[in-house]
A protein has these predicted regions:
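Alpha-helical transmembrane segments and their immediate juxtamembrane cytosolic regions
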Residues: 1-263
Length: 263
């Protein structure tokens, strides 16, 4: 353990760990209905998204071509969201029992990349560009709402309403409607980037946020339910297990690593 701590884990190793955990999580997600997949697969999978988020923060900060980096994430996110759109509205590619996956984590990363760039512009005292980038992400859902209020007839037109739904699902996602990650993931991403360079403060703040959002808040709500027992936080409401990813983040040695360039 001392040797591992001294050397640390590079970016490639962290991504590989995250990928393995993601595979376990997806096996449970897709095949839980068989009753043959242990819940521990999903529990371990809670660490995957935080690790990928951390690696994306580092990747965005160090890449030599942010535009290309962003476009690649956007393209993957848009493609995955487009597939999800057809599953929802056209009921295509669904499982026999009607199940369809809701995997849109790349849409979260698309929005975060814009906010991260805005943060850097603010640091460079390019206030107009920085505020504009962040405001674009925050205000986009409200722009859509205003548009629909001004043109209510759009919602009654099948083709027009479908186009609007597709646009806000795939190419121009809204933070209020993304089905994967959620607002705690987005806030965590902002914290991780804003506090880069102060590793202990960065990871402590992130861990506290995730614990509050994914443990304290659900616990407070679940306590009001009849028959709830605290042990259910370890068997049913285990989204907060993702906070354990901070232990692996602490081992990051700042190196990109070799191989798996497309991860």
């Amino acid at each position: 353990m001392e040797k591992l701590t001294k050397k640390g884990l590079d970016g490639t190793q962290l991504k590989t760990i995250a990928l393995v955990l993601m595979v376990l999580d997806h096996i449970h997600y897709f095949f839980e209905f068989t009753g043959c997949i242990p819940t521990v697969f999903s529990m371990l999978g809670r660490l995957s998204a935080p690790l990928f988020l951390f690696c994306t923060v580092e990747g965005f900060a160090h890449t030599h071509d942010r535009r290309r980096y962003f476009i690649r994430i956007w393209a993957i996110g848009a493609a995955m969201a487009a597939l999800e759109f057809f599953m929802i509205y056209a009921k295509a590619f669904r499982r026999g029992d009607g199940f369809y996956p809701q995997n849109a984590i790349f849409q979260d990363l698309v929005l975060l990349c814009i906010v991260w760039q805005g943060i850097d512009w603010l640091r460079e005292k390019k206030f107009a560009k920085g505020i504009g980038a962040i405001a674009a992400v925050l205000c986009w859902p409200y722009v859509v709402v205003v548009f629909l209020l001004l043109f209510p007839g759009v919602q009654e037109m099948p083709i027009a309403s479908t186009i609007v739904a597709f646009v806000i699902t795939s190419p121009l996602p809204m933070w209020t409607t993304i089905t994967d990650g959620g607002w705690s993931f987005l806030l965590g991403g902002v914290l991780l980037y804003a506090l880069r360079g102060h590793r202990r403060v960065q990871l402590t703040a992130w861990a506290v946020l995730i614990f509050l959002c994914d443990f304290a808040l659900p616990f407070g709500m679940a306590c009001r339910q009849a028959g709830f027992v605290w042990t259910q936080m370890f068997t049913d409401y285990y989204e907060w297990f993702g906070v354990a990813a901070v232990l692996l983040m602490l081992l990051y040695n700042g190196q990109r690593g070799s191989g798996h360039k497309r991860l």
